[in-house]
Design a protein with these regions (language model features):
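A short, flexible helix-boundary coil/loop motif
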Residues: 208-211, 288, 295-485
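Short, conserved catalytic/metal-binding motifs centered on acidic residues
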Residues: 12, 31, 35, 64-75, ...
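Acidic, metal-coordinating catalytic cores used for nucleic-acid/nucleotide bond scission
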Residues: 159-169, 188-191
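Short, surface-exposed basic-aromatic patches at helix termini and helix-loop junctions that form
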Residues: 150-152, 171-181
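An anionic, glycine-rich sequence signature occurring as long contiguous blocks
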Residues: 176-262, 270, 431, 439-443, ...
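Short, positively charged, Gly/Tyr-enriched micro-motifs
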Residues: 1-51, 105-111
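Electropositive, glycine- and tryptophan-enriched low-complexity nucleic-acid-binding patches
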Residues: 90-147, 237-238
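Active-site-proximal, Lys/Arg-enriched surface segment
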Residues: 32-107
Length: 485
């Protein structure tokens, strides 16, 4: 369903139930209400996290991955049942209510798992308390303890993230206590390196070679030695730091700037898989001991900000009137003085309000427990079980689609720009399903595509798939793919 870009059960009504059902080996596809009921039954078992961890172990083992890309994604909430904390949504440049998901991907953008924050957790907090313990416990490491003991510079694995989790003390803890390396952007860069320090390197990013001007120096932050790599482009120097001592200069740059594959993953999933859609709208309570910023404190701070804006405007008006009074003739002085008196009175009133609001804010706690919040503003959260279930299915679809696209790219000239659009075209094209019981085959005959080069690429991929001898689930029929040309 998701591979066909059918984004919710209701959209099944616009597809032939008989023909769509045959793809799954059924007489007809389930009706929308029936499918929702099935999803609800599966979600009620609360096994989605175990399923995700099982898949993450399998994927990480097959990838032999040692680089994990971490980033947050905000699922904006526009409903009224839940009271969610506001998060900054970078793609909209606004603070909006929503749920924050922290995703773990590889450098190709392929997802492993994600963890949902409860209220307004930051990336650094989630790394320390949730993501790293999960990686250490659930996901197999590429290197054994013996290999780590024999090579003191070898990291267990490397985390790649943006400036949000920047903390030299945290980097020191990761390397000294856990042997985990990091690659991230450096904050507060206050010097410029000489242009003669930079040399041109060829860096491979997403299969395309990019020329970069790079330089490297060692630096020390919080008693931990780091490698600092800078990229020079258009008079701007982008600083990257890492505790990984094994990587070459261009490899560090490649891994840092390949972080955009994760951003592209979020964008692609939103557009093609309706990533942020909810199948259920149930609300759950949050642990009452969780400490959050007091909403009343925020409200007072907002009032204080508005009062100070009015004070600044009155001061600017008063200054202009005083200047005009000096520059004008004596006949205009009474008029200017009258205006100055009015504005001075308003200014004094606002200053008194500022002192009153400041006093009120001092008496208000900056952070409180959720249990101490008034009932009408107390935070809760959306049920994440059904959302996780559908996200796991979408992860599987994305990985399957990407694997198929990579197979196509070996036989297709415009693979970088068009391979995903070709995969979508194949998935949505018509095909004949022909059981051949005499030879124990299930023949899938794809209809011809728009151009001969597309057909040629598909034919070569069909041969690769046929060599795997995959059997249709629940039968002894071997899948045989061919294209009608």
């Amino acid at each position: 369903m998701y591979l066909r870009r059918i984004k919710n059960p209701e959209q099944l009504k616009h597809h032939s139930p008989g023909e769509f059902g045959k793809i799954m080996g059924l007489d007809r596809v389930p009706e929308a209400k029936c499918l929702r009921t099935k999803l609800k039954e599966i979600s009620s078992q609360e096994k989605s996290w175990q399923w995700n961890m099982s898949l993450a172990k399998k994927w990480a083992h097959s990838d032999e991955n040692e680089f994990y890309y971490i980033d947050g994604h905000v699922q904006v909430y526009n409903g009224y049942k839940a009271r969610l904390g506001k998060k900054h949504v970078a793609r909209q440049k606004l603070c909006l209510p929503g749920m924050q998901e922290f995703w773990v991907n590889n450098k190709e953008g392929m997802p492993y798992f994600y963890i949902t924050g409860q209220v307004n957790e930051k990336l650094l907090e989630m790394l320390e308390k949730e993501i790293i313990p999960t990686l250490l416990k659930e996901v197999p490491s590429k290197y054994t303890d013996e290999q780590l003991d024999n090579d003191p510079d070898l990291p267990r694995f490397t985390l790649v993230f943006d400036r949000e989790a920047y903390s030299p003390a945290f980097f020191e803890h990761l390397w000294n206590n856990l042997r985990i390396a990091i690659i991230t952007y450096r904050k507060n860069v206050n010097n410029v390196w000489d242009k003669n320090d930079f040399n041109e390197f060829a860096v491979d990013i997403e299969g395309a070679e990019t020329k970069m001007l790079l330089a490297e120096k060692s630096t020390k932050l919080n008693n931990i030695s780091l490698r600092e790599i800078r990229r020079l482009s258009a008079e701007h120097q982008t600083s990257v730091i890492t505790t990984n001592k094994k990587l070459s200069l261009e490899s560090v740059a490649m891994h840092m700037f390949a972080r955009w594959t994760q951003e592209n993953f979020f964008k692609y999933m939103r557009q093609d898989y309706d990533f942020d859609r909810l199948l259920q709208y149930a609300v759950e309570q949050i642990n009452g001991d969780v400490v959050v910023v007091n909403p009343e404190y925020n409200n007072i701070t907002y009032r204080l900000k508005k009062i100070r804006e009015k004070i600044n405007r009155r001061r600017a008006q008063l200054f202009k009137l005083q200047e005009d009074n000096v520059n004008d003739n004596l006949d205009s002085t009474p008029k200017h003085l009258k205006k100055q008196i009015t504005i001075k009175q308003e200014l004094d009133d606002f200053i008194q309000q500022e002192e009153k609001v400041l006093s009120q804010r001092k008496q208000t706690a900056y952070k409180i427990k959720i249990d101490d919040m008034p009932e009408n503003v107390k935070y809760n959260k959306l049920n994440i079980e059904s959302k996780r279930l559908q996200n796991i299915i979408k992860m599987i679809c994305f990985r399957a689609e990407t694997s198929f696209a990579n197979l196509l790219s070996e036989h297709y000239n415009k693979s970088i720009n068009e391979k995903r659009s070709l995969v979508k075209s194949i998935i949505n094209s018509h095909a004949d399903i022909i059981p051949d019981y005499n030879n124990n085959n299930l023949v899938v005959r794809l209809y011809s595509q728009a151009t001969p080069r597309m057909n040629d690429a598909i034919q070569k991929v069909c041969k690769l798939l046929n060599d795997t001898k995959i059997k249709y689930p629940g039968t002894q029929l071997t899948m045989v793919y061919e294209i009608a040309t």
